[in-house]
């Protein structure tokens, strides 16, 4: 999977689509799943969607913004398409991340995340995961697991492991 330039991940979360949307787009939630960090989000096409660096990321030499992005398409709480540029590859081109949320009458929401790294193929192995998640190697599988854990239990994976 590490050579796949268009990677798709699908999970089901026992939460309404609106709650999932808020967890993806609001700092009070984004700081508690994945690799943490607040977001700057201007919810309109062309608006910013930046994942800010945590203090730990800054200690490793990262600047204030870990992931720089722009909103390409937005249809709350169903679809969000973003440009996505990793700050640790300053010479790479932006990639594209698509979030698709489908709510079912049962109370489940299917989350489909597609990351097209064709413009920055060196990211393929990193976003596929397989490394130590505590060192940033868990990729989207780690991040989505954290999102699901937070929404279904109310605590982050780090909090529940403590």
Residue ranges and their predicted role:
Residues 20-21, 30, 49, 71, ...:
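Hydrophobic pocket/interface hotspot
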Residues 4-10, 17, 48, 66, ...:
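Intrinsic-disorder/low-complexity, polar/charged segments enriched in Ser/Thr/Lys/Arg/Asp/Glu/Gln
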Residues 149-162:
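Short, highly charged C-terminal tails/helix-capping segments
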Residues 87-141:
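Beta-strand/loop substructures that line and gate deep hydrophobic ligand-binding cavities in soluble
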Residues 1-40, 44, 162:
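Hydrophobic ligand-binding cavity/cleft-lining segments
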Residues 11, 67-72, 95-103:
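Hydrophobic/aromatic beta-strand elements that line small-molecule binding cavities or substrate pockets
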Residues 41-85:
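Glycine-rich portal/gate segments that line the openings of hydrophobic small-molecule binding cavities
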Residues 17-18, 42-44, 72-78, 100-110:
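A short, structured loop/turn motif at beta-sheet edges
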């Amino acid at each position: 999977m590490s050579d796949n330039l268009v990677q798709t991940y699908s999970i089901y979360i026992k939460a309404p689509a609106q709650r999932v949307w808020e967890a993806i787009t609001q700092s009070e939630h984004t700081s508690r799943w994945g690799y943490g960090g607040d977001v700057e989000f201007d919810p309109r096409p062309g608006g910013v969607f930046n994942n800010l660096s945590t203090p730990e990321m800054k200690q490793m030499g990262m600047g204030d913004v870990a992931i720089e992005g722009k909103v390409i398409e937005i249809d709350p709480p169903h679809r969000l398409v973003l440009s996505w540029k990793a700050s640790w590859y300053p010479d790479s081109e932006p990639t594209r991340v698509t979030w698709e949320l489908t709510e079912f009458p049962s109370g489940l929401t299917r989350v489909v995340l597609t990351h097209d790294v064709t413009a920055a193929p060196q990211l393929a192995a990193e976003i596929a995961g397989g490394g130590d998640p505590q060192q940033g190697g868990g990729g989207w599988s780690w991040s989505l697991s954290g999102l699901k854990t937070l929404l279904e239990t109310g605590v982050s994976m780090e909090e529940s492991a403590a």
